[in-house]
């Protein structure tokens, strides 16, 4: 059975403070072979750096989430750039636009999204894009920055299959997690049916977005088999075919040889 690559997790989150070491020590024995722990704020990026040093199978992504961009300065941007170049840092992220909340203002978010896209281009690493209620501006800024030359993943994909075509044409991957198992996720299921299997990677976004039957509880990489089962059903292929494709795609996404 092909191992699982969780392409997007937040084990640095406070939700794991009580049992983090115990949980992370157990994952490899449960078929979770690789995890990318993803930064969201400057503080969480520091924790990501610690985790990727501490565990062989954990890699990092360093970047500032749109909701945290108000804290960015030229000085902290320079620090980000330095950390992103570490060997075990596989991507710049998570970066993007989030218009669900009123703050930070859209111009601040756009400014730092573009700057972090430029950073990824400069250091030749892919990006992990967070986009919520901001499809048009995300596409426009990615087009402006020639994101097709940078590459990366649209994490926790939540838009239509029509929007998926635009990201596919840019050569991006799609991160799919627990939401796929939700009864009300009709739009996502249609998008996953449409997106070719060679463009899909698995993720948790843990501790958030646990799949059914654990919806509402703390998520972890151990829940990915529920997502695999849902995807196999939608795609009309076996669970092993989903595992194998997702593993191979994850290696390509993050420029890993094996």
Go through each PLM region and give its residues:
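Mid-domain alpha/beta scaffold segments of enzyme catalytic cores
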Residues: 1-258
């Amino acid at each position: 059975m092909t191992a699982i690559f969780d392409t997007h997790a937040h084990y640095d989150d406070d939700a794991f403070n009580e049992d983090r070491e115990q949980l992370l020590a157990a994952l490899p024995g449960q078929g979770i072979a690789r995890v990318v722990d993803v930064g969201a704020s400057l503080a969480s990026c520091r924790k990501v750096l610690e985790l990727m040093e501490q565990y062989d199978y954990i890699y990092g992504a360093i970047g500032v989430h749109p909701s945290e961009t108000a804290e960015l300065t030229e000085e902290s941007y320079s620090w980000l750039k330095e950390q992103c170049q570490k060997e075990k840092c596989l991507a710049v992220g998570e970066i993007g636009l989030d218009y669900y909340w009123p703050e930070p203002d859209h111009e601040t978010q756009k400014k730092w999204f573009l700057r972090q896209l430029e950073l990824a281009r400069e250091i030749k690493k892919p990006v992990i894009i967070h986009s919520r209620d901001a499809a048009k501006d995300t596409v426009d800024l990615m087009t402006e920055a020639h994101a097709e030359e940078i590459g990366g993943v649209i994490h926790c994909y939540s838009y239509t299959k029509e929007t998926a075509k635009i990201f596919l044409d840019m050569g991006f991957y799609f991160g799919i997690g627990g939401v796929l198992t939700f009864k009300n996720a009709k739009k996502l299921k249609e998008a996953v049916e449409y997106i070719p299997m060679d463009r899909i990677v698995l993720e948790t976004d843990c501790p958030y977005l646990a799949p059914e039957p654990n919806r509402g509880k703390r998520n972890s990489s151990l829940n990915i088999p529920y997502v695999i089962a849902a995807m196999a059903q939608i795609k009309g292929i076996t669970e092993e075919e989903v595992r194998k494709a997702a593993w191979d795609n994850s290696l390509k996404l993050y420029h890993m040889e094996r």
